[in-house]
Amino acid sequence: MLIINKKKFRFSDWFAEKVIKAVAFLSIAVVILIFIFVFREAFPIFKMDKKTAVSTETLVQESYGGSGTENSIIKKVDNQVDNSNIIHATNEKPSATLLSKTWMPVSDNPRFGLWPLFLGTFKVTLIALLFAAPLSILAAIYTSMFAKPRVREIIKPVIELLAGFPSVVIGFFALMVMATVFQNIFGYASRLNAFVGGVAMGLAAIPIIYTLTEDALTAVPKTFIEASLGLGASRRQTAFYVVLPAAVPGIFAAVVLGLGRIFGETMIALMATGNAAMISMNPFDSVRTLSATIGAEMAEVVFGDTHYNVLFLIGSLLFIFTFALNALAEFYFKNMVIRRYQSKK
């Protein structure tokens, strides 16, 4: 006797499946629409015609508390243009200034040089990675290989709890506490600088790097550890010469995702870096990052203005870079881990 089992139709299961699928497609559509909107607002910067910008500012002497003449300030000449007072004139597209070394968007002759912002972002990101990555990886090695279960149950939640701290809280801590402590230790002039901002951003990135690294170390097959210990290797040798190399792809993915977290951070950079757009390789000088520039200036720009379009161009660059980092970590490094473990079986 042939018995055919038919799956009973359940409206609740069908409805839940459709809702989940709709939410997934909606999420993808929202990301695509954001991507299109940001690029649409940034694109006009490349279509603007050449404009001649003339500064009518003149240098006049001003004394402070006496008749001294060693100080001078820029004073605007109202209702007249004197050719002898013209400091600069330009006849170039606004997009041509993007590769200059000056970020001066509010001026008679605005300059939108992105190099100071790129350099500031690079300095802060490098400092944050050098601070966060070693601490996170070493902490993950300790909790996965050396810590007792009770200690592991305390350390891991405490570190992961840091991920729940709002960025403004970490930024405020850096502004009020870290900046003063570091200035007293190192004796630099600028209280808020790339070093303070980098360390603060590193604190924000530690939970991400630590959690993913610990997961990668835990995912290493136990047979690797047992074989190493069985051959006479110590637990330290096993951790650093067996487990760590096997988990390298996962650790790289953790660092890359932490890099994306640092690169897109706005509030900490806005509060702790000094926000001075200048070119300097000194880590103790104030800097301005790409994301902090958007946060500081977007609320004050005129809709559709050149400055407005440049800020959206910066947002496009941030979008592309963080998207590329996340895609690299998600697809490339994860596939490396899968292939490595499958080849060992």
Predicted regions, residues:
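Transmembrane alpha-helices
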Residues: L212, P221, L229, R235-M271
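Periplasmic/extracellular loop-to-transmembrane helix junction in inner-membrane transport proteins
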Residues: I4-W14, K18, F43-A128, K148, ...
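N-terminal signal-anchor/first transmembrane alpha helix
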Residues: R10-V38, A42
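Cytoplasmic-entry segments and transmembrane alpha-helices of multi-pass inner-membrane transporters
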Residues: E17, A139-A174, S343-K345
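Interhelical loop and adjacent transmembrane-helix boundary motif
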Residues: A269-F319
